[in-house]
Amino acid sequence: MKQPQKKSAGKRIGMTLLVIAVVLLALFLFYTENYYHADRTAVMSLRTDDHAVVTSSWNGVMFDGPGTEDLLIFYPGGKVEETAYAPLLRQLAEEGLDVFLVRMPCRLAVFGVNKAAEALEEVDDYDHVYIGGHSLGGAMAANYAAKHPEEMDGVILLAAYSTKALPEDLPVLSVYGTEDGVLNRGKYEENLANVPDLQEVVIEGGNHACFGSYGEQAGDGEARIDPERQWDKTAEAILTFLQH
């Protein structure tokens, strides 16, 4: 006689779990879809011209300039539209460093740590391959490099730090701005031990968001230089790093 009550209780539990799952999914989608969009300057940087060929695929965007030897695989920051980094990455390509900008699941690099492997399958062979990224993207790029150091000639971190220990013979470039209000400086300092071969460049007046072109970011400091100046300084630091 108690069988129907047990079945009814089981149905209620099942329905409760289903409702919870739907609510959690809705919250997750709301979180991931509330992201920073590439602005007009970034969109304009996606055009192909005599200086760089820009092509898009399921995995990301390729910036192919006159260089043929060096490639940077770039992971975008969390909840940032990947094409927001087009101005900086295009500038690098025009100056000899081709760049593959990875398209991340839900715009969160934590869900695409191994995307570099797919990028390497898609592009031509290069003599030197580097991996890097901005903020969360930089941290996840460093994680990939820690697991596959033999694939990389260096790591480039923009307002980011490595939570994994990197080999002593793997050079790392760290670039951040003095006005960055998002980068956790305490965590940054704590994790310096993970990057024994470190070159650090501090951009005076630069902030967190101006590595890309997506407007102001919550919690960030106010930049004292314009984005173009920060891109120039960043490109200069990266290209100098490659020479050494």
Can you describe what each PLM-predicted range is?
Residues 12-31:
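Hydrophobic membrane-insertion alpha-helices, especially the h-region
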Residues 69-77:
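Short beta-strand element of the alpha/beta-hydrolase
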Residues 174-176:
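Short beta-strand/loop motif that positions the catalytic acidic residue
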